[in-house]
Swiss-Prot record:
Positions of region (Disordered): 131-164, 246-295, 386-424
Protein name listed in UniProt: DNA-directed RNA polymerase III subunit rpc3
GO cellular component entries: RNA polymerase III complex
Gene: rpc82
Bias-annotated ranges (Polar residues): 411-424
Biased composition (Basic and acidic residues): 398-407
Taxonomic superkingdom: Eukaryota
Composition bias, Acidic residues: 272-292
Subcellular location, record wording: Nucleus
PANTHER family found in the cross-reference section: DNA-DIRECTED RNA POLYMERASE III SUBUNIT RPC3, RNA POLYMERASE III DNA DIRECTED -RELATED
Organism listed in the record: Aspergillus clavatus (strain ATCC 1007 / CBS 513.65 / DSM 816 / NCTC 3887 / NRRL 1 / QM 1276 / 107)
Length: 635
């Protein structure tokens, strides 16, 4: 990410959120890379009184890495571009958390995000996290969002100390169980390269490593480095907060089912998915209310921060659901959402490597297998699954004597469940059919696996991440050069390097149109031309010209262009804000805000509407470009 436009964008984000002082230090670190305190003071032109408190605050916001060398004891500082970029994604993250866990959880997440990292005891004293007094003895809407409880206990007193942990600590537990917040570790304040070098230094000093030689020593150091790095940076808080792979207190889509519905799920005979009935019943015994009003406080000295890697996984799943909604029915998309929700709980990050893998060089990475019965449990029982797939006809041949088999309701096992819903076996089969639809080309959103005789479903993450990148590039090429160029690019991507004649034969295009399209795309950097001479003379008449399409180079180029476009949007927004500075200061006054029609003239009201429309347009464009960055870089 360390490029000119990425550094420019991150500096603009830091200035927009934290002010000019932070931006000056951040820009100096991005320009000169890694600096100690005297050099940073010299290049930034700041005094110790300005620099030291600002560095401490930037370290708390995780905008700056710091590392003290073991050789000379000097502390070096380095800009954290990744953490600075996540400032542009803060609104999207808070919107997602509010939709998933409720408004109060989003408020807690916003407070942690604003502080960089925070101690639990400090969060207890924040005014914005205090419960509203109006909900003392009534129904608490925020608490209902987090735990799924419908009412608070009637014995609550109006004491502030009794209310506060009943609301804050369960919310923190739910956020930790989902993986959205993690424990702060010391290694998280150091860059990835510094952590690797430090781990290698520790490993090479061990006697058992010193006794090894050659390739064996290198392999042991690499393996030990990965283990030690994971141990030092692991801040997982989900231990003890998960039940059967699902966070305690997580809301299920069918949490409001009728009281007449059975507490235990019906036995299912489809493909032996419920072979171990006792285990399934034990899993189904816990409910959304198990963690409801669990006032056991979290450790007051625990320091937590936002886990952006986990939130990238959740946002990536949202993109997968959008693809499913384009080509499948709403019921199929909801089934897919239940599968992805289960997978999300057990997926810590989008990919294992920090660097973006090259096309064709990364191995396939499958998600954890999710049992079909678990997906069927999470699907809303009121959802009509049979309406969007073909009718299920199971032929029942007569037995040897030609007698008609007994009806199921004769023995009291009617296939129709409560409220006319199908039985567990039929419904599990229907869920499997919907997942089979998603496994079909061209997207192949799911993959079926048989594990120990049970049907499980997985998602091929790297394949879908590549598919997202290709779809984004194809959409861009079609918008710029038309559908003919899109056809040419698809041929080159499928066949590799081709000369003009062979490309014309496959694409079935006239030479004139083909050459025009290739020339325009080459000028735009989407296709390249390779010259292969037939002899040492290198004459043009004795040279083969091969056209090819390199998605890795194009993705990197598009990523840099996207950084540049986002920077220009922020610069334009700042210019427009400075141009209307006096007017905007007037509209932000406490007496004017909310009473614009009373204190502003008609011309000022029209100007205010124009400014809001322009601001919404630029911020919306930045959000759209951020989606492209996530596809090209993060997913």
């Amino acid at each position: 990410m360390a490029s000119q436009y990425a550094a420019e964008l991150c500096a603009l984000l830091v200035e927009d959120n934290f002010g000019e002082l932070f931006a000056r230090i951040f820009s100096t670190l991005t320009r000169y890379d890694r600096l100690n305190l005297p050099r940073l003071k010299f290049h930034s032109g700041l005094s110790n009184r300005q620099l030291l408190p600002a560095l401490a605050a930037m370290i708390q916001q995780h905008l700056v890495y710091h590392y003290t060398s073991y050789d000379d004891g000097v502390t070096y500082y380095e800009a954290n571009l990744q953490s600075a970029y996540y400032l542009v994604r803060a609104g999207k993250i808070l919107e997602f958390v509010e939709e998933r866990l409720g408004k109060y959880a989003a408020t807690v997440m916003s407070s942690i995000m604003y502080l960089g990292h925070a101690q639990v005891s400090h969060l207890e004293n924040l005014p914005e996290l205090q419960p509203e007094q109006s909900h003392t003895n009534g129904v608490d809407k925020e608490h209902d969002e987090v735990d799924g409880d419908e009412e608070q206990p009637n014995g609550l007193s109006g004491d502030h100390s009794d209310q506060q942990p009943a609301l804050l600590h369960p919310t923190l537990k739910v956020l930790a169980a989902h993986g959205y917040i993690i424990r702060v570790r010391e290694a998280q304040f150091q860059s990835h390269a510094d952590n690797i070098l430090d781990a290698e230094r520790v490993l090479k000093s061990r006697p058992e490593i010193k006794a090894m030689k050659g390739k064996r020593m290198e392999e042991a150091v690499i393996e030990g480095t990965l283990e030690l790095l994971k141990e030092r940076t692991d801040g997982d808080l989900t231990r003890g907060l998960m039940v059967q792979g699902v966070p305690r207190g997580a809301k299920r889509k069918h949490g409001s089912k009728s009281a007449d519905a059975p507490n235990k799920k019906a036995r299912v005979d489809f493909a032996s998915v419920d072979e171990d009935d006792e285990q399934d019943e034990e899993e189904n015994e816990w409910s959304d209310d198990e963690m409801g009003y669990d006032t056991t406080p979290m450790e007051s000295g625990l320091v937590v921060r936002v886990n952006y890697n986990k939130l990238d996984v959740a946002l990536r799943n949202c993109r997968f659901i959008q693809i499913a909604e384009q080509d499948a029915s709403p019921a199929t998309a909801e089934v897919y959402e239940c599968l992805l929700r289960r997978i999300e709980y057990q997926t810590h990050q989008c990919r294992d490597t920090v660097e973006i893998p090259r096309e064709g060089e990364e191995g396939e990475q499958y998600s954890v297998p999710i049992a079909l019965s678990a997906v069927a449990e999470d699907v809303d029982p009121r959802l009509d699954l049979s309406g969007s797939i073909g009718p299920m006809e199971i032929s029942q041949p007569d037995n040897r004597r030609g007698k008609r088999p007994l009806e199921d309701d004769v023995n009291g096992t009617n296939h129709e469940g409560a409220n006319g819903l199908s039985s567990g076996g039929n419904r599990t089969f229907e869920v499997d059919q919907h997942l089979c639809l998603l496994a079909q080309p061209p997207h192949n959103l799911t993959s079926k696996r048989i594990v120990s005789g049970l049907i499980t479903w997985t998602v091929e993450f790297r394949h879908l991440a590549r598919k997202l990148r290709h779809l984004e590039l194809e959409r861009m090429i079609e918008a710029r050069y038309g559908d003919v160029a899109l056809r040419v690019v698809r041929v080159l991507h499928a066949k590799g390097k081709l000369d003009e004649k062979r490309l014309q034969e496959i694409s079935l295009l006239p030479f004139k149109d083909l050459r025009q399209v290739l020339a325009s795309m080459q000028a735009g950097g989407f296709v390249d031309l390779q010259e292969v001479p037939r002899d040492a003379q290198r004459q043009p008449s004795r040279t083969i010209y091969l056209w090819y399409y390199d998605p890795d180079r194009i993705c990197n180029s598009v990523l840099q262009d996207t950084y540049k476009a986002m920077s220009r949007c922020f610069q334009r927004l700042r210019f427009e804000r400075n141009r209307l500075k006096e007017f905007l200061e007037k509209t932000e006054r406490s007496d004017v805000k909310g009473n614009e029609e009373r204190y502003l003239s008609e011309g000022e009201l029209a100007l205010l509407q124009q400014w809001k429309a322009k601001e919404a347009l630029l911020i919306g464009e930045v959000a759209r470009l951020d989606e492209m960055v996530a596809v090209m870089r993060d997913y």
